């Protein structure tokens, strides 16, 4: 589970955060302000301070928040002076925006607030549509406005160039005051409540948020233009309401509720991506006629409220179509306030004890949950103040009496010397508020005595009554220690201490077991300074005033650490233990494992000369499955399957799979030797729990053996057994090697193959259809690796994962999977369907099409009917996590309602309607989620689109490895601190660009190439281990009339892939001129490609001929790649179709030397280097 934060404010106005993977409340870094309320999302938090002003807290990150300012310089040609600044009266401004209608001089741009700073000065953009311009950046046209080109022609009468400048948001990890530039007469009065949400309404612009606020006069305000590139927003807009509003709550989508001072609730209707402020209000009455609503909180499709008698209510029937819901249901408990966060999870603050409670059991099927459970986490300051004391206490419990007695005198002496320590003053402003909840049970006898504490006292570490701490001299304290010893005369009841790791030994003394178990007071464990800013007692829990979970993602599959308190230990020391470092633990476990391994070998060697009692053993597993038969008509038929395993005299275990079927009432069978199977993979076929077995021959035919089980568990049992049998037959065990080739199927399944040295041998390389692929647990969209064993992956939701060195996971369990380094992994992706309509002169666009038209609800091709009701998740492992929504990010653009228009089906679609458009479509999306496990750990917090690791490196294990990436926003990043011991690295280094990028690759000698979103190519200069980010970008012209989408760099070769599936090779690359000179076409029908450390080329190809038709998504290997023939000669076809990604960047194993050349060169598999269609 990735880390996210729960925000809370205590009664003193201090802001705390609690991580979903932590156990302690951490005080906000910026503690200069006191707050009343906060509202948080993942990327930021907004709050109202005690001065009633609005502040925002933006998290720091490796990727800066940058905004690009641009203006255009326009010139016209005249016969006297040529191009000059003098324009015609009808022309646009000399300095203008892109349309020419707005006057924009360079000095007219100012920073929007003190929280921004300029990143650089103005400079000219020398790029137009992915093509570099001449020096100076001018583009030419006949007149304003027109189509501009980079080439100057005889009729070019006007020209313009683009100036750009970046500003950077600098106030991160601090509370930044929201300044207003509005008319002073319309400035909002002081604020009383604030709520942020709406991030799921639209993703345009990126990171858009809806910020709603309530003023002291009961007016509602909306903050305009809050997004990722403008975290402060621009202006406040007043929203009219039917009454005076007391409090407001905004959900992640289109749900907005507010409470009136009269006790009713009002609901905002008409909120959508085109109108985020909504249209009108509807009124909802209070669930109780006697007590009105005082607080409300909304989620995606839930509403919770608190009435004035502190009762908790849940609103039934709330959704986007009915935001008002249907009825109220009373919940158990009394709360001051509640807050609904991500996934509709609920938090509340108890009415009596001011403790934060978490609503357990909230699921998509049970939105109201089951029970309230208190969060019992302590504060981070408590852990830091008692770290050494607690480690001593924990350590003392594990040592024998001899060791304890040896240190007894030392501890007593240290206790005497610690008596001179004085503590700071203890605040007395909590005297009227006794401890509540869990704190009350442990300190009920002491809480009320804190009021009499003087301003400067000396606290006795052995006194369980922490409130009684009279000032005393050193002699008085010694006497008090002796008196405490006399009250505990029994040695057996004394918990002795040890002097191991004594960082603050002088602060500790002998403590009785009875005293320790009966008190949770931190002062009973040792002295510590209570700072002047400390508002609570030593072990008192904070008293909370507000909580916000809008940025807290609670994973239902991962338990939280917020509730566990070990018995017998105080809450302040619950997570502290022996001061044994992880390195010591790892060395200890490694030593034990080594000793056990040596003993096993020693015992076996003494008996190897004995004769085997059984020379051969046979084991058979049978079952009933379905088989997709080979002959027409192809359909599923019931078969009996038997897996026979036998062990020969040489100890080798082999297996045969028999499939028995009936053909014309005659019993027949087919058999497969598992040592010939090249891959076993789960496939999607007609909604069955099916999997496929490939052999080299069936790989060539593109026609595997497909079997289906009745249940998912039965399918996984067979997959696990067959995979383990194949690995045993080939003597493959353990994690993949550093030279392994990784690939990902279109389902997101991860496979790995151990390359043979003959794979790149010339002139007779090993055919890649004979490669054996085994599955690795997890779910990813792409994987990248190098020859140092560093492997990174990116999921469909752009989450980044790093390989832990394990193997197995997923359905592969038991002996075929490693016990360590397997972790829970999740992924989210979208399922798309299309709504199609045709125009007719009577009703306009409607769902009534022609008989020859596609289905009115279909997939992208239109050949398969896909409605909202019958569309299922990709497999039973997936579950829906959202409802259907219109996708406005479809390629080609959409109108305000998401429609795309075309002349007919199928055709090229565009986002605006013309007179010739008789059909239209729009895409609907729904998110689904899979939870599995595998040898992967998440690398937070940046989400990525592409990644590249230097394919080979001669550096030491401790030296850093070059790793470059593209974020999902298009930022270029360089990872620092990546080593073989720490493959996850330490931090990101942002590399500035003038536009978003989509692909990047780093070669074996630190050559960094990238592709921008507009299809242009760039080369990064001066990249080296001492200068990992390089110095500048060089614009490389793309192949003529082609837009690039991927680049891959090997040792000396650079290949790119354009959006039409053409593969290109960069010619003329030399150490003195690394940019190269020209592009040379290699092949077509390519989907993805990867260039290895030896310049070997592997691709995912489409339209590969098989025995039953064309296959898409086939792994192919380029043969004949030599220094004198870097483009290679032909394609060798491997596993597929249905593959999405392959990487060969870890395979640095050289082919064996001394091969005898054949008399004639092998005939290429295709002409002109093209994949066969």
UniProtKB/Swiss-Prot annotation:
Keywords: Autophagy, Cytoplasmic vesicle, Lipid-binding, Lysosome, Membrane, Repeat. SUPFAM superfamilies: PH domain-like (SSF50729). It comes from the Eukaryota. Residues 618-727 form the PH domain. It is found in: Cytoplasmic vesicle, Autophagosome membrane; Lysosome membrane. Transmembrane segments: none annotated. TECPR repeats lie at residues 210-239, 254-285, 301-332, 344-376, 739-766, 962-991, 1007-1037, 1053-1083, 1095-1135. GO terms for molecular function: phosphatidylinositol-3-phosphate binding. One of its GO terms (biological process) is autophagosome maturation. Residues 413-430, 486-495 have a biased composition (Polar residues). GO terms for cellular component: autophagosome membrane; cytoplasmic vesicle; lysosomal membrane. Residues 431-456 have a biased composition (Low complexity). Residues 475-485 have a biased composition (Basic and acidic residues). CDD domains: PH1_TECPR1 (cd13300). Pfam families: Hyd_WA (PF06462), Pex24p (PF06398), Tectonin (PF19193). Residues 413-495, 1147-1173 are annotated as: Disordered. Tethering factor involved in autophagy. Involved in autophagosome maturation by promoting the autophagosome fusion with lysosomes. Binds phosphatidylinositol-3-phosphate (PtdIns(3)P) present at the surface of autophagosomes. Belongs to the TECPR1 family. The PH domain mediates the binding to phosphatidylinositol-3-phosphate (PtdIns(3)P). This is Tectonin beta-propeller repeat-containing protein 1. It comes from Gallus gallus (Chicken). The gene is TECPR1.
